[in-house]
Swiss-Prot record:
The keyword Membrane applies. The gene is PDE6B. Residues 851-853 form a propeptide. One of its GO terms (cellular component) is photoreceptor disc membrane. Its cofactor is a divalent metal cation. It is an enzyme of class 3 (hydrolase). It comes from Bos taurus. The active site is at residue 557. This is Rod cGMP-specific 3',5'-cyclic phosphodiesterase subunit beta. Keywords: Acetylation, Cell projection, cGMP, Hydrolase, Lipoprotein, Membrane, Metal-binding, Methylation, Prenylation, Repeat, Sensory transduction, Vision. A lipid is attached at residue 850 (S-geranylgeranyl cysteine).
């Protein structure tokens, strides 16, 4: 039976082993040489020897490539291309091992390499990678087991995944794959696909595969170690320069972060990065809580940090490193700022996770912009974001890095480097915190020294002016019984009727400062708190006298003003019937707050403290003077000989201090407009009750509403000079204006700034107009609403209206004079102009009464 040529070809193709043995015996080197153009190497006696010589030459060529070319992809590409020829595989591929977000994966670096392929066609760009998690596909299985795998039929392999086949319209039949190891660590996986001259890869193919890959392994190891060395070098430089800048800048966390991030920008290997700093406030101020409690504002329902803070980026710093370098600092950034709009920084601040996103535009969880962000045409491709955590495990900010410079996604080494930087900076916050605390202590010390130098506590001689125990009893107050002291005070104090302390029209102009101290003591007796709360009477006298001395001798914000505010508070409670809502303890705290509300006032406002860089401005961020008055009042009360709260229990003491906090800070007019609408709603709410008793019962139990009313009472007391009889108000207004003018003089001379009209003594004639504006814009609402709230307070509103008429008349008179003066000046200017024209030969003006015929 004869065989056809085709049958012989098929037999030899299907039996490569037999063909190898047969041609090894039958073919001589001369026969092969005749078939080849290059001839035959000398000394070869068989075909097998000739194959070994060719293989040695190929391996030598690979070694030469490795010596001459440091490019890993190019060397491995040549190895894969030769492997395809030797193994008779359809194609080979290289998968690089990496980790992102703590999850290992394999990504295509060289894909579908064939004997005639070109490197540029097989090199996979970062945005076209095929990525396999280790639990998917044969390559993932190889990376997990770290062993070679020879899959003779992929349909019978449980690990096979057709994912890549579906993407490339290819059919995989068999696979030979092996891991590239560096010690115990996987560096890459190389895979050969589809044996062309047989049904599957053989054991001899496995030997050849491993033999060639020994060289590939060496090259990949060198590449991997070089990359790790580069990463560690960058990491060392980042930490070194960060430490340098951290210890160079200890005063301000923002400047510290900025200097460190800017200095290490060259080592971060990205196009852009953005640092968002978080608000560290854990508890809101009471005036921010009130709108929520009153139902006027929605409670915050957004994301929070792990320690419960609202996520609020108070500043974002953008570092742009591509093209022309630029740094942009955005205070109070809007929600649609490009670095925040995706929601990634907020998510990182909420979860504390490190997020490494390979393909940002395709990410479904975050909303990254797909097109260019700006005119530069820059597009977000891959993102690495991580929290900046301090030593207390609090997230103080979020650092987000965009687009690795080589186009590849950020990997585990990038995560380690960036995390080292953010962790170091987070821990370094301890330095700025410590410095900040030391700075505050230093400021407190300076302020305390100033207080000690200026204020002198009530001494033994001064107390005898009010409590003359030596004259009456021949002994010091400390040696007297409470009944003895009470008897003396009853004789010495003026009584409520003498100076009209129950009246809204009370005036201090006819009183001495000592008489005002006595009236202050009398108010505590009228409230009934001296006996009820066991206030030592010597302590009460010392406290009032010390408070009076605590006020500086300035034009308006002196002891007289402090007493007037307390007296108005007393009158609102007693005469205005507002005490029906408050307990005796609360009334006790409110009058005390009135006495202390402007203690140690400097005669200048909060803005001046900031402009002049006063230590107070460095100590208190907002309501600067009000917080200082509060601290000074507490300072006096902390002294045992002045502590009128000394016999209160712990709960009572906490309550009165809390009320003083609210009452004194509420005198900041900057907060007045925040509480107006809330107070108005309470007044409107009171009109829904038919009888006052039920309303009083309701409001007495509503803590938040009572605090809002109390805060507005403090404003009404602080502005009460505007409601005094005209003969009193006109004089007090001049005192207020004089103090403002003094501040204006300081601004002009010390700060070299032009003061506003209200504080410019050169515009003193405009005082009536300014008073009318102040009454309309600030005062009218307060007293109108209080007169609606309690009709007993109507006299204050009536006198306010009367005073407005008086000021308006003066303002109109001034305006008329100014207008007349302007008209006279205009006529004079016109006359001069006409005279000049006549002198220059021009026509004389016509007379309206005479005519020349």
């Amino acid at each position: 039976m004869s065989l056809s040529e085709g049958q012989v070809h098929r037999f030899l193709d299907q039996n490569p082993g037999f063909a190898d043995q047969y041609f090894g015996r039958k073919l001589s080197p001369e026969d092969v040489a005749n078939a080849c153009e290059d001839g035959c190497p000398e000394g070869c006696t068989s075909f097998r020897e000739l194959c070994q010589v060719e293989e040695s030459a190929a391996l030598f060529e690979l070694v030469q490539d490795m010596q001459e070319n440091v490019n890993m992809e190019r060397v491995v590409f040549k190895i894969l291309r030769r492997l395809c020829s030797i193994l008779h595989a359809d194609r080979c591929s290289l998968f690089m091992y990496r980790q992102r977000n703590g999850v290992a994966e394999l990504a295509t670096r060289l894909f579908s390499v064939q004997p005639d392929s070109v490197l540029e066609d097989c090199l996979v760009p970062p945005d076209s990678e095929i990525v396999f998690p280790l639990d998917i596909g044969v390559v993932g299985h190889v990376a997990q087991t770290k062993k070679m795998v020879n899959v003779q039929d992929v349909m019978e392999c449980p690990h096979f995944s057709s994912f890549a086949d579906e993407l490339t319209d290819y059919v995989t039949r068999n696979i030979l794959a092996t891991p590239i190891m560096n010690g115990k660590d996987v560096v890459a996986v190389i895979m050969a696909v589809n044996k062309l001259d047989g049904p599957c890869f053989t054991s001899e193919d496995e030997d050849v595969f491993l033999k060639y890959l020994n060289f590939g392994t060496l090259n990949l190891k060198i590449y991997h170690l070089s990359y790790l060395h580069n990463c560690e070098t960058r990491r060392g430089q980042v930490l070194l320069w960060s430490a340098n800048k951290v210890f160079e800048e200890l005063t301000d966390i923002e400047r510290q972060f900025h200097k460190a991030f800017y200095t290490v920008r060259a080592y971060l290997n990205c196009d852009r990065y953005s640092v968002g700093l978080l608000d560290m406030t854990k508890e809101k101020e009471f005036f921010d809580v009130w709108p929520v409690l009153m139902g006027e504002a929605q409670a915050y329902s957004g994301p929070r940090t792990p320690d419960g803070r609202e996520i609020l980026f108070y500043k974002v710093i953008d570092y742009i490193l591509h093209g022309k370098e630029d740094i942009k600092v955005i205070p109070s950034p809007p929600a649609d700022h490009w670095a925040l709009a995706s929601g990634l920084p907020t998510y990182v601040a909420e979860s504390g996770f490190i997020c490494n996103i390979m393909n940002a535009p395709a990410d479904e969880m975050f909303n990254f912009q797909e097109g260019p962000l700006d005119d530069s045409g820059w597009i977000v491709k891959n993102v690495l974001s991580m929290p900046i955590v301090n030593k207390k495990e609090e997230i103080v900010g979020v650092a987000t890095f965009y687009n690795r410079k080589d186009g590849k996604p950020f990997d585990e080494q990038d995560e380690v480097l960036m995390e080292s930087l953010t962790q170091f900076l987070g821990w370094s916050v301890l330095n700025t915190d410590t410095y900040d605390k030391m700075n505050k202590l230093e400021n407190r010390k300076d302020i305390a020294q100033d207080m000690v130098l200026y204020h002198v506590r009530c001494d033994r001689e001064e107390i005898q002016l009010i409590l003359p125990t030596r004259e009456r009893l021949g002994k010091e107050p400390a040696d007297c019984e409470e009944d003895e002291l009470g008897k003396i005070l009853k004789e010495v104090l003026p009584g409520p009727a003498k100076f009209d302390i129950y009246e809204f029209h009370f005036s201090d102009l006819e009183c001495t400062e000592l008489e005002l101290v006595k009236c202050g003591i009398q108010m505590y007796y009228e409230l009934g708190v001296v006996r009820k709360f066991q206030i030592p009477q010597e302590v009460l006298v010392r406290f009032l006298f010390s408070v009076s001395k605590g006020y500086r001798r300035i034009t308006y914000h002196n002891w007289r003003h402090g007493f007037n505010v307390a007296q108005t508070m007393f009158t609102l409670l007693m005469t205005g019937k507002l005490k029906s809502y408050y307990t005796d303890l609360e009334a006790f705290a409110m009058v005390t707050a009135g006495l202390c509300h402007d203690i140690d006032h400097r005669g200048t406002n909060n803005l001046y403290q900031m402009k002049s860089q006063n230590p107070l401005a460095k100590l208190h961020g907002s309501s600067i003077l009000e917080r200082h008055h509060l601290e000074f009042g507490k300072f006096l009360l902390s002294e045992e000989t002045l502590n009128i709260y000394q016999n209160l229990n712990r709960r009572q003491h906490e309550h009165v201090i809390h009320l003083m906090d609210i009452a004194i800070i509420a005198t900041d007019l900057a907060l007045y407009f925040k509480k107006r609408t809330m107070f108005q709603k309470i007044v409107d709410e009171s009109k829904n009750y038919e009888d006052r008793k039920s309303w009083v019962e309701y409001l007495s139990l509503e803590t938040t509403r009572k605090e809002i009313v109390m805060a507005m009472m403090m404003t009404a007391c602080d502005l009460s000079a505007i409601t005094k009889p005209w003969e009193v108000q006109s004089k007090v207004a001049l005192l207020v204006a004089a103090e403002f003018w003094e501040q204006g003089d300081l601004e002009r001379t010390v700060l070299d700034q032009q003061p506003i009209p209200m504080m410019d003594r050169n515009k003193a004639a405009e005082l009536p107009k300014l008073q009318v504006g102040f009454i309309d814009f600030v005062c009218t609402f307060v007293y109108k609403e209080f007169s609606r709230f309690h009709e007993e307070i109507l006299p204050m509103f009536d006198r306010l209206q009367n005073n407005r008429k008086e000021w308006k008349a003066l303002a109109d008179e001034y305006e008329a004079k100014v207008k007349a003066l302007e008209e006279d000046q205009k006529k004079e200017t016109t006359a001069k102009k006409v005279g000049t024209e006549i002198c220059n030969g021009g026509p004389a003006p016509r007379s309206s009464t005479c005519r020349i015929l």
